[in-house]
C-alpha cells in the first residue's frame, strides 16, 4: 500500500479544506453540528495515516528483513505512531471540552498537545545537533 506524493498532497488538501469549511460553518452558527462531527475529516485523515504507518511497521516483521539496517527507522516510526495518538487524544479532549461533556480545566485539555510539541522539539534538536550522516 503506497501512495504517491501527488496523492498524499491532494488528500491532505481535500481533508483540510473540508475541515475548514465545516469549522467556518460551525463558528458562524450556520450549522448546528456537534463538534465531533466537525472533526470527522481530521479523524479520517489520521486514520488513513495510522493505517499506512502500521502497515509499514508490520512490514518489518516479514521474513527476510535484515534488522541491522533500520533500527533507527523503527524508532522514528514508533515516534510517528505516538505523535498521531497524542494528536488524537488532543482532538478528543478538545471536542469533549467544546461540547461541555466534562468540566475539565482547559490546561488539562492541552496536555497531549504540549507533550506532542515537546517531543517534536526534542526530535528536531536531536536531528539538528546529533545526527551527522
Swiss-Prot record:
Enumerate the transmembrane spans.
5-25, 35-55, 78-98, 110-130
What highest taxon heads this organism's lineage? Eukaryota
Using the UniProt record, give the first listed, main subcellular location.
membrane
Extract one GO cellular component term from the record.
membrane
Q: Where is coiled-coil annotated? A: none
Q: Does the keyword Transmembrane helix apply?
A: yes
InterPro entries (alphabetical): TM_Fragile-X-F-assoc
Q: How does it sit in the membrane?
A: Multi-pass membrane protein
Question: Would you tell me the protein name for this molecule?
Answer: Transmembrane protein 60
Q: Whose protein is this, by species?
A: Homo sapiens
Q: Which gene encodes it?
A: TMEM60
Amino acid at each position: 500500500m503506497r501512495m504517491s506524493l501527488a496523492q498524499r498532497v491532494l488528500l491532505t488538501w481535500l481533508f483540510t479544506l473540508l475541515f475548514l469549511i465545516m469549522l467556518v460553518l460551525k463558528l458562524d452558527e450556520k450549522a448546528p453540528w456537534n463538534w465531533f462531527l466537525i472533526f470527522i475529516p481530521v479523524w479520517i485523515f489520521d486514520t488513513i495515516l495510522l493505517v499506512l504507518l502500521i502497515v509499514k511497521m508490520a512490514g518489518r516483521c516479514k521474513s527476510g528483513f535484515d534488522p541491522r539496517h533500520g533500527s533507527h527507522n523503527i524508532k522514528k516510526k514508533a515516534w510517528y505512531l505516538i505523535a498521531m495518538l497524542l494528536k488524537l487524544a488532543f482532538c478528543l479532549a478538545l471536542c469533549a471540552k467544546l461540547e461541555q461533556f466534562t468540566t475539565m480545566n482547559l490546561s488539562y485539555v492541552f496536555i497531549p498537545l504540549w507533550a506532542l510539541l515537546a517531543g517534536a522539539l526534542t526530535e528536531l534538536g536531536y536531528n539538528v545537533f546529533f545526527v551527522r550522516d
